[in-house]
């Protein structure tokens, strides 16, 4: 059943029973997430973390011909400062205390007109914040009024920053608004390209996948990240859709299939040799270019076999902190290189991505599993207990692992997708191993020994309804 009749997307907690509080073992996590609903837990102590507003802003900021307005106080308006591109610009309504009482509609109207006159965008996105959600400002009236005046789509992104503990909800909210207000609802014909859905991947990751698609002569468009408004509108005309990270883009792919009959080719994340091979062969089978794809994959495999030592990580204990959809691919790759995965962390588990846990059954069932958005103090506890040699992370804030004596391999701003990503990860490990000896006697970290001697799930409790 399509969710597009709803005004906005449900949170992951409501739609898919997302769990973002767990600290235990792989076996325990599989057991707790195996029912028709996932048993919820809470953290009685929690570190600060990102929210869905930040995730929504991040993906919208990569759409090339759109203007973004952060409708809220100046603190929320500053989220654009995280952008690396100094030329990137956005707008804030800069709501103050008076606006929370009398309403901020006039400031929003002014911001929309200014954005249109200065940037001449093809669409304007208005991102919600806690102040607007609490005030319940009439954003839709402003949209209806100004759309007639300026003649382009003005789209409300119904984020609030506090109703969900799962930031990926921000991607769902963006997806819902794009489907409901922007994508062409009456495609006249199917075009000879596929949709490649990307929400969080770097431009380097996209380039690695595009390299393989071009080798197979597959026409494509990437969306919504690094796309244009016209490309997003054309998503309903594609011959098929693939998703680079299923737990982020699956919602968009399924709705395109259900509402617009664009087939969704379900694949795993194209990380590592096996993951990339499975991704390409599944796509090639649908597009009937299997022979070409098989030849291409065989050539790449032969080159990888010549270039990579399968004993690089012998004797190394590894903790993986990443999106759950990518952890099985990481774990396979690191195990094939001789490493031992002793634990992992992921932001959430829900009814859809929990199938990734079964792909980890080749690991010891007693390895540590930490589910939470951030929560580095718990991961420091796990690293200290597990005597981890290498901490692999997709996220910001990895210095705590170095403080615990682990060598950090960060995949942020690196191309880890596709076959090229195997070389990038391999080279990163070579450098990490070279540096690991220099960390002997490293500082024991910012977290007290008394905390690290406690059970890692000290603050994680069963939710009582």
Can you name each region flagged by the protein language model?
Residues 1-465:
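An N-terminal assembly and electron-transfer interface module characteristic of large anaerobic redox
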